[in-house]
Amino acid sequence: MSRAWRGLLPLIVLLLGAADVRPTQEYLSPEIRAAQEDPSRHPGWLWVEEGEALWRAGEKACATCHGGIAAMAGVAARYPAVAPDGELLDLEGRIERCRTQHQGEASFGRESEALLALEAAIALQSRGMPVAVATDGPAAPFLEEGRRFYQTRQGQLNLSCGQCHDDNAGRRLRGDVISNGLGTGYPAYRLEWNTMGSLHRRLRACSLGVRAEQFPLGSREYLTLELFLASRAKGLPVEAPGLRR
């Protein structure tokens, strides 16, 4: 194989793997899907309303710089993204950085009610828009890390992410339908949690499910995996805040 073809191989594999990726909402039951689209039936809207209030709260409110929260349309569709300093940030990380560096406030903390609420309200502004994360330039090395994580067998069960979410997508496991494992609906209200939660909380649950190491929320491992999942979802609609079983 020529050097040029070897260089293109990771891209070819990525494109082939994404060929059958479907929006997560297509794997939901009719009842869950209908409730996800109906604010009066979606418990996550309590967090959205709290997030909208947080957007306007404080002397240095988010609204002071950005105006109405509708100005965030399209933002969630572009995350994770590489910041000018070279750090890979998900939407939660971007919110926290804005809070500490520009608002002079203490960080909310990963998985806190306030951060999830603000993230849900911001993500809602991109609902229905196509995922459009950057995967070239400074994002390329992070993408490759995430791809390796996705394809590597892990834990006592010796399973990779792809063995569930590619090879067995559409089949049932513990009464639920296996999706393509995209993060387009997060943050999401999960009925099993009885609360709103982040994608990284869900990834930790997946790690636990295969009896593998659970990495910290916001870890490089989960951030790069999140970027890879978003690359698989490019062109598919943002569903956040989602509703999941």
Language-model features: locations:
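Electrostatic cytochrome c docking/interface patches
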Residues: 24-57, 124-154
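A structural feature that tracks compact, well-ordered secondary-structure segments
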Residues: 52, 94-98, 102, 106-107, ...
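Extracytoplasmic/secreted proteins, especially bacterial periplasmic and envelope-associated proteins
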Residues: 46, 50, 90, 94, ...
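Hydrophobic, ordered structural segments
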Residues: 33, 52-59, 72-130, 150
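Short Cys/His-rich "knuckle" micro-motifs
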Residues: 71-75, 171-174
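C-terminal capping alpha-helices of c-type cytochrome domains
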Residues: 104-132, 212-244
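N-terminal export/targeting leaders of redox proteins
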Residues: 1-37, 41, 49-53, 106-107, ...
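The canonical Cys-X-X-Cys-His
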Residues: 58-69, 118, 146, 156-168, ...
